[in-house]
């Protein structure tokens, strides 16, 4: 499709939506829009590697394509409607909160944006001046990223559960695996093996403690996104009565 569009002379801009994780970032970093040169062994999952591969292929093979690569960070919920448009990924935070333990530190940051902010940013990229052959993060950045401690406290407030930050424990994946048989008691009916696989996958990403720099996006006039903790209560309200196992099916069909 991209090859065909590169031959359309009237085409002014071609937006490819990838993922911020396609650069395979190192831990504890502020990640700027990097070169398209990551290697397969740097990627934990095929998804991010495939995104990185197509970005590089379009850039190298289609020089006439008016390409802009947009890299959203973690898209969770809607700033006004909560999880009504999509509950993707939100269940991960509920899972951690319910367990009271996970493989990340409470002070680790996570770069989350609402889906409406992501959509508005993509529309802005279609017409922004001076944006061509660029890689641009759509992300929370330094000012709007939040820590897991802040998320934990916001979930406690939104759910009305009496729990303290001190209740949380950082554990290893091995320790999570050892508690696999208790998952049904904690989460209700669920596929314990799928649940554990999800913990392994998202545990890796959550432990990276990375923030994706959004200076480029702000420079073309985008506003700062709402913090995840500012609309998290709406995500809780819109998923009330739905089990974590049911929410997982959005991402693990």
Locations of regions flagged by a protein language model:
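Secondary-structure transition/capping motifs at alpha-helix termini
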Residues: 2-12, 60-66, 128-130, 158-163
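Mid/C-terminal beta-alpha module of Rossmann-like enzyme folds, strongest
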Residues: 124-200, 219, 235, 242-252
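Active-site loop of classical SDR/Rossmann-like NAD(P)-dependent oxidoreductases
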Residues: 201-215
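Active-site beta-alpha turn of Rossmann-fold NAD(P)-dependent dehydrogenases/reductases
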Residues: 15-18, 62, 71-73, 139
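NAD(P)-dependent short-chain dehydrogenase/reductase
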Residues: 29-30, 59-111, 115-128, 154-158
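Short-chain dehydrogenase/reductase
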Residues: 33, 40-52, 108-112, 145
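Conserved Rossmann-fold NAD(P)-dependent oxidoreductase catalytic core, especially the SDR/UDP-sugar
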Residues: 1-46, 68, 77
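Conserved catalytic Lys-bearing alpha helix of Rossmann-like short-chain dehydrogenase/reductases
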Residues: 1, 50-58, 92
